[in-house]
Amino acid sequence: MIEPSEGNKQGRDFVHLHIHTEYSLLDGACRIDQLMDRVKECGQTAIACTDHGVMYGCVQFYKAAKKAGIKPIIGCEVYVATRTRFDKVNKIDGNNHLILLCKNETGYKNLAKLVSAAFIEGFYSKPRVDKQLLEQYHEGLICLSACLAGEIPQAILSGDYERAKASALWYRDLFGEGNYYIELQDHGLEEDNIVLPQLIKLARETGIPMAATNDSHYLRKEDAKMQAILLCIQTGRTMQDADRMEFQTDEFYVKTTDEMYDLFA
C-alpha cells in the first residue's frame, strides 16, 4: 500500500501487504529473519505475512518483526472454493486466491478459524474456505482482491467484467467500506496489461479503494533462481525442463519504496 508520510525523508512510505515466506512451502523464498533485514534496508516500518493457505509462520514472523522494530501484520492468502468447500469434483472445483489481513485480535481469531476449517472441511488439492465461511468469520479482517489468481482478476481475464464487478461489490458489502481493497500488481506480465486497466476502472466505478502490492516470493531480484528451484522441487521437475512451472519475470521480490512508487504513483 502506498501512503504519503511526513516521517519519510522523501515524503514517501510503503508497506508490503503480499509476502510469501518460507512457510509458503516450496514456493516462498523469503526467510523471515532475512525478510526483516530487507524491510529495514528499504526503510519500511511495517510488513505483512500472507503465506498460501497457512499460518504456520505467524508466531515466528511476529516475534522477528517485533525484535527488529517493525510492525507485524498477520495475514494469509487463502484459497476460496469456486463453489463450496464441500464440493470436490475433479476439473470443476478449483479455487481463487484472496488476501486476508488481521486488524485486531478478533480478526486473528477469525483468520485462525478460517484456515483451520479450510484444512478440516475444505481440503481439495489446497485448503479451501468458501463464501459461507467468510460470511461467518469476516469480522476484524481486511480483505484484498489478491493476485491474478483472485476471483476478480480471473473474471476479467475470462472477459466477464460485469461478473468481476459483482464479485467486488459482494466482498465490499461483506467486509464493509474501508475493509476491502482492489489489489493492483504489475510484474511485467502480459496478463497484468489486461487486468490492471480494468481493475482501476472497476475501482473508480464502485468507489472501492485500491492498494498497490507486489506478490513477493523472494527478497531481491537476483533471488529469482532460488525460487525457481523451489518450484522445481515442488513439481518434480528440473531447471532444464522447458515446460517446467516458472514465474515469467523476475519481478516477484520485496521491492523498495521508490520501486513501488515508480510502478504506481
Identify the role of each PLM range.
Residues 1-265:
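Phosphodiester-processing cores and adjacent nucleic acid-binding clamps
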